[in-house]
């Protein structure tokens, strides 16, 4: 099985740190989201991954599908601050 590579940028940090992750294309994208969140030390349960265009990605698909639909450049958003007042 071939691998796909994602560059995931943490948008909540002003320095915009990023991690490059390579995973088998059959990997559930929920696992990619969880691993990326753990790498940035943010809670996976309240995080989302979006494209650079701001389009949300449904994690209920394989990493290969996400790569084909959205490419390799993604952003991780911790949702704990979204919508709070």
UniProtKB/Swiss-Prot annotation:
<feature type="cross-link" description="Glycyl lysine isopeptide (Gly-Lys) (interchain with K-? in acceptor proteins)">
    <location>
        <position position="83"/>
    </location>
</feature>
<dbReference type="Pfam" id="PF03671">
    <property type="entry name" value="Ufm1"/>
</dbReference>
<feature type="propeptide" description="Removed in mature form">
    <location>
        <begin position="84"/>
        <end position="85"/>
    </location>
</feature>
<comment type="function">
    <text>Ubiquitin-like modifier which can be covalently attached via an isopeptide bond to lysine residues of substrate proteins as a monomer or a lysine-linked polymer. The so-called ufmylation, requires the UFM1-activating E1 enzyme UBA5, the UFM1-conjugating E2 enzyme UFC1, and the UFM1-ligase E3 enzyme UFL1. Ufmylation is involved in various processes, such as ribosome recycling, response to DNA damage, transcription or reticulophagy (also called ER-phagy) induced in response to endoplasmic reticulum stress.</text>
</comment>
<dbReference type="GO" id="GO:0061709">
    <property type="term" value="P:reticulophagy"/>
</dbReference>
<keyword id="KW-0539">Nucleus</keyword>
<dbReference type="InterPro" id="IPR005375">
    <property type="entry name" value="UFM1"/>
</dbReference>
<dbReference type="GO" id="GO:1990592">
    <property type="term" value="P:protein K69-linked ufmylation"/>
</dbReference>
<protein>
    <recommendedName>
        <fullName>Ubiquitin-fold modifier 1</fullName>
    </recommendedName>
</protein>
<dbReference type="InterPro" id="IPR029071">
    <property type="entry name" value="Ubiquitin-like_domsf"/>
</dbReference>
<dbReference type="GO" id="GO:0034976">
    <property type="term" value="P:response to endoplasmic reticulum stress"/>
</dbReference>
<dbReference type="GO" id="GO:0005737">
    <property type="term" value="C:cytoplasm"/>
</dbReference>
<keyword id="KW-0833">Ubl conjugation pathway</keyword>
<keyword id="KW-0963">Cytoplasm</keyword>
<feature type="cross-link" description="Glycyl lysine isopeptide (Lys-Gly) (interchain with G-Cter in UFM1)">
    <location>
        <position position="69"/>
    </location>
</feature>
<comment type="subunit">
    <text>Interacts with UBA5. Interacts with UFC1.</text>
</comment>
<comment type="similarity">
    <text>Belongs to the UFM1 family.</text>
</comment>
<dbReference type="GO" id="GO:0071569">
    <property type="term" value="P:protein ufmylation"/>
</dbReference>
<keyword id="KW-0832">Ubl conjugation</keyword>
<dbReference type="GO" id="GO:0005634">
    <property type="term" value="C:nucleus"/>
</dbReference>
<keyword id="KW-1017">Isopeptide bond</keyword>
């Amino acid at each position: 099985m071939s691998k796909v590579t994602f560059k995931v940028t943490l948008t909540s940090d002003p320095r915009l740190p990023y991690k490059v992750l390579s995973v088998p294309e059959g990997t559930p994208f929920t696992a990619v989201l969880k691993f990326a969140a753990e790498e940035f030390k943010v809670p996976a349960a309240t995080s989302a991954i979006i494209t650079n265009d701001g389009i949300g990605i449904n994690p209920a698909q394989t990493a290969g599908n996400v790569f084909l639909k959205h490419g390799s450049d993604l952003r991780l958003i911790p949702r704990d601050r979204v919508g709070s007042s």
